[in-house]
Structure formats: structure tokens, C-alpha cells
Amino acid sequence: MFRLLRWRLGRTLLRAAGRRCGGCTARLLPERTGDAGTGAERLRTRGAPARGHGVLPLLAALAWFSRPAATAEQPGEDASDEAEAEIIQLLKQAKLSIMKDEPEAAELILHDALRLAYESDNRKAITYTYDLMANLAFIRGQLENAEQLFKATMSYLLGGGMKQEDNAIIEISLKLANIYAAQNKQEFALAGYEFCISTLEGKIEREKELAEDIMSEETANTYLLLGMCLDSCARYLLFSKQLSQAQRMYEKALQICQEIQGERHPQTIVLMSDLATTLDAQGHFDDAYIYMQRASDLAREINHPELHMVLSNLAAILIHRERYTQAKEIYQEALKRAELKRDEVSVQHIREELAELSRKSRRLT
């Protein structure tokens, strides 16, 4: 009755992670400075503002899964005994505490749940609780602790007979790769991403041979998991300045998301923005503008929660194309929207960009 958590525990968790661990959140990429095509342009994450007209990548798997995959059973109300019912209630309380950004309370509750799971010898409950504890440690930036907990979760799953290519194992492997990426353990990170991507691609090829006319939910979730792995790998390659490789990964991830989720899905828009960021970093400003303009149009249509960030990115690309007046207008709109969202990080960044743009304009006159 226990389902492993999806990669995202919801947008609230990602926001909480961003507040608590700027460089080691679910977004993972620390601030970086480097030459990007035409000069010293800065690529950085939302959590790490930097001076200069840099594009702000919308990093993270915001909503790859629009619904949970049916890889295991979810905790329900039909607990078979009192101990399991109590464990389920504790896990629900812990998840609620996490969503309310109360990690200390969640940790205490999870330890109680784990104790009960061991006392009742409930292997599924033990596995589920370890996974939730690992996710909590990860979003708090406790990477070494998260690593050990994820490995413990994987050990329990494999020990219970789960196959190595099961989506749940791939998700944990992806989380471990992201931890290694945050720790700048390049060899381990890239090996982890390669394992996840190659395993899923092989799995999808085998499933194609048995494919029916209508894609099953399980197959769709496998595609989405592959897209999430490509997305994560692309972010790390972008951070590592392997820009052309990052571009290819983003292109594949975007194609998957468009096909499965649709062009208007929030995650599709995020990927368009990230791909534009990567193109911009290589000096491909015209191509970057096409993707970012489309992303901003779609973000307006669906009232995307991070429209202000897309607009900020669009303005940065307009500056690179020397369209300063239009860039200023877009930045001003982005600033108003960021203030309404009370996104202090973006507000600070956009104000700095506007100030820099003003100085640049004075030098040109």
C-alpha cells in the first residue's frame, strides 16, 4: 500500500527547497560565470542572482508527471491492521508538514513511522518511509544523508524483487545522480545520468515492439521519466559548460514533453525557456529568441506561475539582440509581476538588470 514518492513532492516543496538550500535544491545548479558566445554572460539559477544580463534558467522538474504513475499502490484507507493504519496516518502528517515547510516536525514524525514499520516488520512501509526521509533530506540540502537514505530505499526495493529497470529504481538513481551533480562529483553524476537514460531508452524500445495503438499510462510515465532524466542531465551539462550536449538533451526532453503533455503544459514552457537559455549561452541569439518568445506567449495564455521569470529571460535575450527599448519594457512588466508574486529573488535580479541596462543605454548615447 505504499507508493514511492514521485520526483517532485509538489511545487511547495521545490519552493521550500529553494529557500533552504540555494545551490543544492531540486534545481541543483549553483551560480556559474562563464563566456557564453559573445562574451562574459552569466548563466545562473533562480536561487543565485548575479549581475550582468544573464538568462534565468527555469530549472527543475516542475510538473513532469501530471498524475502519479501506477508503479505501486498508494497508501489508502483500507489498512489491514492497526499498526499499518497508524503508520499511514503518520506518513500523511509528515507529508503535510513538508508541504507546510516544517521540515523539523516532519523528520520527527518520520522517525516515529519508521520505528513502527520496523516493529511491525512492514517492509513496504519501511521502504516508503526511507524514501520520504531521503526526499526530505534532499530538499533540506543534507546531501550525504539523502544519499545514504536513497541507497537504503533502493536496497529494500531490489531485495524485495524489484527489477533494476523498474521506474522506481530509475527515479532513485536519478536522485542520486542529482546529488552527485550538486556535490560536483562529475564522474558519478554523468555515469548516473547515462545509466538512467540508456536504461529507459532500452526499455522504451522493447515496449515499442509490443506497442498497442493507444499508449498505456505506464508507457507514458516511462517516457516522462526519460524526459525528466534528459532535463536533469541537460542542466548539469549546462552547468559544466558542455553547451552543445546540453542543447541536444533539452531538445529531446522538450520533444517528449510536447508529445506526452502538450505544448501548453507548464513543464513544456519551462523546457522551452531552458532550451532558449542554452542557445543564448552559445551565442545563438535569434534561435534563442524564437523559443523564448514562444515560451512567453504560451506562459501568458495559461497564466504560468513563473511568467515573470520567462519574461525576464526574454528581456535578457532581447538585450543580446541589441533591442534595448523592448528589453526595458519587458523587464518592467516582469518586475511588476515578480512584485505581485512576492518573489524577492527575481525582484532583486530584475532591478539589477534594469540598472545595468540603464548604464549601458547611457554609454551608447
From Swiss-Prot:
Q: Which SUPFAM superfamilies match?
A: TPR-like (SSF48452)
> What GO terms in the biological process aspect are recorded for it?
mitochondrial respiratory chain complex III assembly
Q: Where are the TPR repeats?
A: 127-160, 220-260, 269-302, 308-341
Q: Keyword Mitochondrion on this protein?
A: yes
Pfam families per the record?
Answer: TPR_10, TPR_12
Q: Which GO terms describe its cellular component?
A: mitochondrial inner membrane; mitochondrion
Region forming the signal peptide: none
Keyword entries, A-Z = Electron transport, Membrane, Mitochondrion, Mitochondrion inner membrane, Repeat, Respiratory chain, TPR repeat, Transit peptide, Transport
Give start-end ranges for the coiled-coil region(s): none
Knockout consequences: Mutant mice show progressive neurological and energy metabolic decline, decrease complex III activity, increased production of reactive oxygen species, extensive astrogliosis and accumulation of ubiquitinated proteins in neurons of the thalamus. Compatible with a Mendelian autosomal recessive trait. No evidence of embryonic lethality nor evidence of obvious neuronal loss.
Assembly, per entry: Binds to the mature mitochondrial complex III dimer, after the incorporation of the Rieske protein UQCRFS1. Interacts with UQCRC1 and UQCRFS1. Interacts with ZFYVE26 and CHMP4B.
Supply the name of the protein: Tetratricopeptide repeat protein 19, mitochondrial
Species name: Mus musculus (Mouse)
| Gene that this sequence comes from | Ttc19
